[in-house]
Amino acid sequence: MPINVYPYDFREFLDVCQVPYDKLSLISTEGKARMMNRLNDYFHHGGFPEGVLMKAKRDYLLSVYQKIYLNDIVARNSITNIFGLKVMIKKIAESIKQPISFSRIANIVSTTGTKLSTTSAVKYMEYMESSWLITKVTNMAAKLADKESNAKYYFTDNGILDLFLIDADTSLLENLVASDLIHRYGRDDAVFFYNKGIEVDFYVPEEELAIQVSYSIKDEDTRKREVKALQAIEKVLPCKRCLMITYDEEDAWQLSSEGIEVIPLWKWLLR
């Protein structure tokens, strides 16, 4: 049986950084600040073991991406259209949070001047998944063919994703929640999104857990939209728990039969 190896989770990351995260430590202003400082580091630079204590983290992550991921995918699968592969990876990074079809990604790459067929896009996506660069989350409400051809893709580590994005904290937040869920529950039909009249970021059947991800819900329109989606999903799927995960906001509302919890990212990761 293959062993799935993931980057450090947040607890392991804090252990290596020697930052305590017990309840007593987090009650103090200083203790909470130390933990939040490390969270920002983990959020942007990920959890690859060798890079945790490095100062030149971006250089290290570029090296990991180019020498391990990119070179491995190219060499192991005898890819000749390297530029097309690079463009495809960048476009997947820019499409975090959105379902993306094989034909659409092939068309996007082809507009850059390097032709990429839909068949090649399918193969490249499979290569990226098998190398653990990305993981797939499918639409629970979709038919089988659409599940495979119109999925969402997330990067296994936030540090690699951050190489491709500028000022994109919302994408990094959703990616980190996705990678944490997949780490906890597995890759194979354990974590889904739901999109059929209702858009819900994640649903975990094993836990009957529905999750919306929003960097902040201080804006009233944003809050109403996220609440509406969670209230609606309860009428379609069994939901023992409905969560909104934010970067650093917390609340609880009894707006549905089970209530809706607003939980900050750090508390979710340390659960």
Predicted stretch roles:
Residues 248-271:
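Domain-level recognition of nuclease-like catalytic cores that cleave nucleotide substrates
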